[in-house]
Amino acid sequence: MITLQAMMSALSLPESVRQLLNPVMNQPFGQFVVDSRQVGQGDVFVLLKSQNVTDSIDLEKVAGYLAQVADKAAFVLSEIDVSALQSQFMLPIIYLPSIRDFLGSLIQTSLQQQHPTKLPAVIAVTGTNGKTTVSQLVAQLISQSGIKTAVMGTAGNGVLGEKGQPNLIPSTHTTLEVFNLHHAIDDFAKQGVQALAIEASSHGLHQQRLQGVPVNVAIFTNLSRDHLDYHTDMDDYAQAKARLFDKAHFPTLTHAIINLDDEFSELMIEAANASHLTVWTYSLTNDQADFFAKTILPSLQGGDLTIALSKAVTPQGKLTVNSPLLGRFNVANLLASIA
């Protein structure tokens, strides 16, 4: 069991939020849970709004969720104003409309307080295409240097074996929901994982599923028309991606790797520069990029690639790569991964 009071020194919460939490600050609890069906005795139930923009709040359904946890939860943290239902339940319910801004940090801190571990360095990849390939390549490259590495994304989640091949468990989402994501990272840390390559979807970024994840390096591959059933337009879609390069959202960020050939690269570079990140660019066409595909010699077996490196990266000047991957899009994926 742990208390919010014991966690406060490790959290950067606004004073207004701390004041709202005061009534339950010293209440012992087990863990934060976002699914009412999974709440155990003494857990904290976190009641969140549906992220489907067409869904309205159904208080009758909300009352059902609260009834499920009424005799088990230590208290409830709610993104929904349930004051109209409060008298029906004999448990503290704290209304926190901004809870997604710090929910990941709450979950991570509670896990660390109860079972301290060294969290892995995180490389997060965002973009319409290439996320899976780049995250897999990054994980394999890091693993080849002798660092225990894991990967998370569309293809599944798992730790890479001795030969660099991941043992993947199927994933329900490209980017897991915040509760499952932090528990997965905690499990990797307990296994001694030192580096984690993770896909950061626009849905995951917009819904703050990655909040509290210690991202060190952010990679942008590209942006094309997709997910416009969720995002209002391309600008909204791009802004969701740009969150990954903002230290206000990811304070542990140090580096940004950005595809200079994409029309939205300027937006990502602006976000990274505003956060004073080290920015490295890559390109198939622009020789001013930090990682430039100077020569590409394709073959049926893949191809040879000569990469010109900027002095900002290394005085070495160039790097030659032989790859079995086919297609120019995979040259871009290789550039991102090597960067």
Could you tell me what each predicted segment is?
Residues M1-T109, E263, T295-L297, N322, ...:
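N-terminal leader/targeting and accessory segments in enzymes
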Residues L59-A63, V178, H182, D290:
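Structural motif corresponding to alpha-helix initiation and N-cap regions
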Residues V82-S87, V217-A339:
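Acidic, Mg2+-coordinating active-site environments of NTP-dependent enzymes
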Residues F102-L260, F264-L277:
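Phosphate-binding loop of NTP-binding sites
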